Curated annotation (Swiss-Prot):
Keywords: Carbohydrate metabolism, Cytoplasm, Isomerase, Rhamnose metabolism. This is L-rhamnose mutarotase. Its EC number is 5.1.3.32. Homodimer. The active site is at H22 (proton donor). It catalyses: alpha-L-rhamnose = beta-L-rhamnose.
Length: 104
């Protein structure tokens, strides 16, 4: 398993809505994540800065990255774009993080 971490950014005032939307994550989106090898996926929020920290374990990063090509993922991005910083294709603005420590 590969460990993948990134940060994303909420627009101010959207903490509750972001949590609500993820509490109600579409079953099709859950299935797509799992089908692309995602496991142990967590997202944390720094409430002072509206910064999100995402962590996911993936079987193969190249396979996981292909989720971006799916219709359900693109629909999810469009749904989330009004409440978080997004790219022109509606994907969230994300900064991949480099792992600097790991304790097994």
């Amino acid at each position: 398993m590969e460990r993948v971490a990134s940060i994303m950014y909420l627009y101010p005032g959207n903490k509750e809505e972001y949590k609500k939307r993820h509490d109600e994550l579409w079953p099709e989106m859950k299935e797509a994540l799992k089908a692309h090898g995602a496991a142990n996926y967590s997202i944390f929020l720094d409430e002072k800065t509206d910064t999100l920290f995402a962590y996911v374990e993936v079987e193969d990063k190249a396979i996981y990255d292909k989720i971006a090509e799916t219709e359900i993922c693109q629909k999810w991005w469009k749904y989330m774009a009004p409440i978080m910083k997004s790219n022109p294709n509606n994907s969230p603005v994300a900064v991949d993080l480099k792992e600097v420590f790991y304790l097994a």
